[in-house]
Amino acid sequence: MGIYLSTPKTDKFSEDGENDKLKLGLSSMQGWRANMEDAHSALLNLDNETSFFGVFDGHGGRVVAKFCAKYLHSQVLRSEAYSAGDLGTAVHRAFFRMDEMMRGQRGWRELSALGDKINKIGGMIEGLIWSPRGSDSNNGQDDWSFEEGPHSDFAGPTCGCTACVALIRNNQLVVANAGDSRCVISRAGQAYNLSRDHKPELEAERDRIVKAGGFIHMGRINGSLNLTRAIGDMEFKQNKFLPPEKQIVTANPDINVVELCDDDDFLVLACDGIWDCMSSQQLVDFIHEHIQKESSLSAVCERVLDRCLAPSTIGGEGCDNMTMVLVQFKKPITQNKKADVGEQSVKGVEEAEINAAEENGS
C-alpha cells in the first residue's frame, strides 16, 4: 500500500461542547492518506478555571500523536508551575516531558499498547478527548523512569508529531507550538497567527540544525524530515553533549501569551492538512461565513474539511489527514479595555511572532 488510498475516507469524528465561557466544535478526517496519524485533545474544564485544546499531527507513524493526546495535558496539570499559575512554563515543560516519558520500559509499554489499540480498530478514526483523571493524573508518584524490564534501554520512538496547544484561563490565552500545525485567532474578523511554522528554511532553525551536526537537503532535515521541531523523532536527538533545546530536532515550543478582549471571535487549531489548502485569513473568513448558518461548530469544521479535500491525489494539496478544533468565545469576554494581541510574554520562554495573516501570506 502506498501513502494514498484509491478513494478517500471521508467519514469524520466530530464533537461539540461548551461551558460558561466557551463553545467548542472539532472534526477530524483521514482523507486520502493510507493511515490516520492525527490526534487531538479537548478539555473544556481541565480544572475549574482552565480549558485545554491540542492538535497533534503524526509523521512516520501515529503512536506519538496518540501518546501526546493522552498524556500532555496531565503533565501540564501536575506541574509545580501550573499550581503557581504560570501556564506558559507548565506547558513548556510538558512538551519536553513527552520525550522523557516515551523512553525506557514504561515508554515502550505505553507506545506498544497505543499501537495495538490503533491496529485493532482497523484504520477507523478514533476520537481522543481524554479526561484529566486518567492513568497519569495529577495524583500519585511520577514513576515512569523507575519501571524496569527488557526494554529499559529503549531510546524512544523514531516517529514523531507536531504539537499545537492552547490553554485558556480567565482572560489569558497561552499557545505552545512545536512543528507546523497552527493556532489562529480571529479578532474583529482579522486573522492573527499565534504560532509560527517551524520549517528548515527559517534561519534560526537552520543554524541550530547545522550546529547540532545535521544538514538540510531539498528542504528536509538530513534529507528526511520537513519540519524542525517535534515531539518524538528520537533519531535526531542523540547528541549527548547538547541539551534538548539544541538538538537537531527539538520539542522546544514557542510560547505566546495573549490577553483576550471582546473583539476576539474564535480560536482555531489545525494541522497542516488544513493550512496547506487555506491561508489563515481565508479560513477565518470561511468560518465567519458559515458559523451562523450551521447548527453546530463541529458542522463548521466538517465544512472546512470537505472544502479542503482534494478531488484526486494529483498535486498533493488536500490529500493529508485533517484535524480542526474551533473554540468560540462567549461575550462579554472581559470588561477591561481592549488589549493588544501578544502584549504579554512568558518570562524565560521565547515568544512566538504574531503577524496579521495577510502580512506573511499565511
UniProtKB/Swiss-Prot annotation:
Reaction catalysed by this enzyme: O-phospho-L-seryl-[protein] + H2O = L-seryl-[protein] + phosphate; O-phospho-L-threonyl-[protein] + H2O = L-threonyl-[protein] + phosphate
Keyword Plastid: no
Listed InterPro entries: PP2C, PP2C_BS, PPM-type-like_dom_sf, PPM-type_phosphatase-like_dom
Binding site for Mn(2+) 1: 57-58
Keywords assigned: Hydrolase, Magnesium, Manganese, Metal-binding, Protein phosphatase
Binding locations of Mn(2+) 2: 57, 272, 320
Domain PPM-type phosphatase: 23-329
Family designation: Belongs to the PP2C family.
Protein name: Probable protein phosphatase 2C 11
